[in-house]
């Protein structure tokens, strides 16, 4: 039988397959009746059923917690991949050649800084501390200072620093030296830290301030006397008694009684300078609150003493006038008052130092040949810059702005005078500025000027000021740094003699320094006058007094390395302090940073600007 294929073409149908649905149903019923009626055992069931499908667990039992299976597998996979990747990276790193990145070598100024600080260790008096900075040929000395005269007010004057090539302790230049070191630390602590010398310089400052606190009644609010000098340098008729200039001997071998000079009144310059030293050091040691507080109290007491009976400490032909004669005292009052304001924040000091009268008395409006020559005697240029700092960073406004603006302008004029274009100061053919107008021992003044110029440059840069005006001409801060570098480079050896004037720096430096301790072998004990054979010797010093900046060349760039001529070869505390300050200002990379703007103002509260007086009534 054929049917029609709906897609086209015949379709053959087998007749045997044409049973009806009823027939199929009856056949199935017959099959069901043939099925055994008893239940199947498990084995038989397994023949008929497929394998049992087990449902996967969604969690993993870790004993103490249940974790999602997906999270567990993902975490495990991540750990495995990370471990493989880490191992691969480690293998690569180990197989690659290693390039060790060493720190860049220190610059010349940093090297010279480390050397220059050693001079202060060589000048220490008293029972020396045991530390890494000790000088091998120096030992305890002058342990009886202040103890031999029952008439002295202060019985313990052990400590401090010897001034130069002798063993006298002059408190006036010593105070100035400590102030300079403190100022440089306040401004450039990061650079000292980078050079590895911060703790060293702080120890040197504290050695000085600890001694100063012994030289007056530092616990009192008011005093009537202070020590100005320990030791004597009197020469000429009547000087046959043993003293520090009559004898040439190591300080360790001094056996004679050392005189103590005291000032009972008219000590304005000395007291104000020592107040500056203590006040500035109190900022350096501000984290040592008790010590800083003691320094501030002592500074206040000294400044009060300085303002009660005003006059020069070296007047009336005193011995100090032969060595460190102070030309005036008002500049110290300005200088010390500025430091006390920064140390205390007391506006009474600010009002004093910004008065027109005090500035005029200090010579701020003058134009002497030595205007701008910063030294142990003339603090005016330092005070002007110190107060300019306040105007640049605090802008206190009325009523201080007028005088602070004057100080700012005066500082600018001083900096102009340092530039070679204005010829206020001559220069040697080798380029050394003659700030003391051709007189001997020029380097201490040069180092001080180099410090002021570098510092003013950093002040301007920190205040986002690119330069300053000299009349109609504008100069960038780089002119200041070039001046500073040129003068310090001269001192370090870039001069016609190709000689460093800092002992221990460079290949060529003075070998016959005018210095008692350095000129006598350390194991040789000489009598008072027996040591003069070493002074007159043509041989080099047996002990190198590393870091000492000698007095320097003459106005023709000439220099004689002769021990007997102190105008060429004697170093001083004041000179080395200026050198250290200039070196740290120039040292290091720009990345180390410039000045620390804020530490100086750590004790200064926010200033409330006063309301200026109303203008005078207008009249037609």
Swiss-Prot record:
Cited PROSITE patterns: GH9_1, GH9_2, GH9_3
Cited PANTHER family: ENDO-1,4-BETA-GLUCANASE (PTHR22298)
Molecular-function GO term, any one: cellulase activity
Positions of region (Disordered): 1-39
Protein's cellular compartments: Cell membrane
Record's protein name: Endoglucanase 21
Gene: KOR3
Source organism (scientific name): Arabidopsis thaliana
Keywords from the UniProt entry: Carbohydrate metabolism, Cell membrane, Cell wall biogenesis/degradation, Cellulose degradation, Glycoprotein, Glycosidase, Hydrolase, Membrane, Polysaccharide degradation, Signal-anchor, Transmembrane, Transmembrane helix
Basic and acidic residues composition-biased segments: 21-39
Topology term for the membrane: Single-pass type II membrane protein
Cytoplasmic side: 1-70
Annotated glycosylation sites: 108, 134, 217, 325, 346, 409, 426, 482, 567
Catalytic activity as recorded in UniProt: Endohydrolysis of (1->4)-beta-D-glucosidic linkages in cellulose, lichenin and cereal beta-D-glucans
Extracellular side: 92-620
């Amino acid at each position: 039988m054929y049917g029609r294929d709906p897609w086209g073409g015949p379709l053959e149908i087998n007749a045997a397959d044409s049973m009806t649905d009823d027939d199929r149903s009856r056949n199935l019923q017959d099959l069901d009746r043939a099925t055994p009626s008893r239940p199947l055992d498990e084995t038989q069931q397994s023949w008929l059923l497929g394998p049992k499908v087990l449902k996967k667990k969604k969690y993993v039992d870790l004993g103490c917690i249940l974790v999602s299976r997906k999270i567990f597998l993902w975490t495990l996979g991540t750990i495995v991949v990370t471990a493989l990747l880490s191992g691969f990276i480690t293998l690569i790193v180990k197989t690659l050649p290693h390039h060790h990145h060493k720190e860049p070598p220190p610059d010349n100024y940093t090297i010279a800084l480390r050397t220059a600080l050693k001079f202060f260790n060589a000048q220490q008096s008293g029972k020396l501390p045991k530390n890494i900075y000790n000088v091998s040929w120096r030992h305890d000395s002058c342990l009886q200072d202040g103890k031999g005269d029952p008439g002295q007010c202060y019985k313990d004057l052990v400590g401090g620093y010897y001034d130069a090539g002798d063993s006298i302790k002059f408190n006036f230049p010593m105070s100035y030296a400590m102030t300079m070191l403190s100022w440089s630390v306040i401004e450039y602590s990061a650079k000292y830290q980078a050079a590895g010398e911060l703790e060293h310089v702080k120890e040197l400052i504290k050695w000085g301030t600890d001694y100063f606190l012994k030289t007056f009644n530092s616990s009192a609010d008011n005093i009537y006397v202070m020590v100005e000098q320990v030791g004597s340098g009197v020469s000429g008729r009547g000087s046959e008694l043993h003293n520090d200039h009559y004898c040439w001997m190591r300080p360790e071998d001094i056996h004679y009684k050392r005189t103590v000079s005291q000032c009972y009144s008219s000590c304005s310059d000395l007291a104000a300078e020592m107040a500056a030293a203590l006040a500035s050091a109190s900022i350096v040691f501000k984290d040592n609150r008790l010590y800083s507080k003691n320094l501030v109290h002592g500074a206040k007491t000294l400044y009060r003493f300085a303002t009660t009976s005003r006059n020069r400490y070296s007047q009336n032909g005193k011995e100090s006038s032969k060595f460190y004669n102070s030309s005036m005292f008002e500049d110290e009052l300005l200088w010390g008052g500025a430091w006390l304001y920064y140390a205390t924040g007391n506006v009474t000091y600010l009002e004093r130092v910004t008065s027109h009268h005090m500035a005029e008395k200090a010579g701020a409006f003058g134009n002497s040949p030595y205007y701008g020559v910063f030294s142990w005697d003339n603090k005016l240029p330092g005070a002007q810059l110190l107060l300019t700092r306040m105007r640049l960073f605090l802008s206190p406004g009325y009523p201080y702005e007028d005088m602070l603006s004057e100080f700012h302008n005066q500082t600018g004029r001083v900096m102009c005078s340092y530039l070679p274009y204005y010829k206020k100061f001559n220069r040697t053919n080798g380029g050394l500025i003659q700030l003391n107008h051709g007189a001997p021992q020029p380097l201490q003044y040069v180092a001080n000027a180099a410090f002021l110029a570098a510092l003013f440059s950093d002040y301007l840069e920190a205040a986002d000021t690119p330069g300053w005006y000299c009349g109609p001409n504008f100069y960038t801060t780089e002119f200041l740094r070039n001046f500073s570098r040129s003068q310090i480079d001269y001192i370090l050896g870039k001069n016609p003699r190709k000689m460093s004037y800092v002992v221990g720096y460079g290949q060529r430096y003075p070998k016959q320094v005018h210095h008692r301790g350095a000129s006598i072998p350390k194991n040789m004990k000489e009598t008072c006058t027996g040591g003069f054979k070493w002074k007159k010797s043509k041989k080099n010093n047996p002990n190198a007094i590393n870091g000492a900046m000698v007095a320097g060349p003459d106005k023709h760039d000439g220099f004689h390395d002769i021990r007997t001529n102190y105008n060429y070869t004697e170093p001083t505390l004041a000179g080395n302090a200026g050198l250290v300050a200039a070196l740290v200002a120039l040292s290091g990379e720009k990345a180390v940073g410039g000045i620390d703007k804020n530490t100086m103002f750590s004790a200064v509260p926010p200033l409330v600007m006063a309301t200026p007086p109303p203008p005078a009534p207008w009249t037609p």
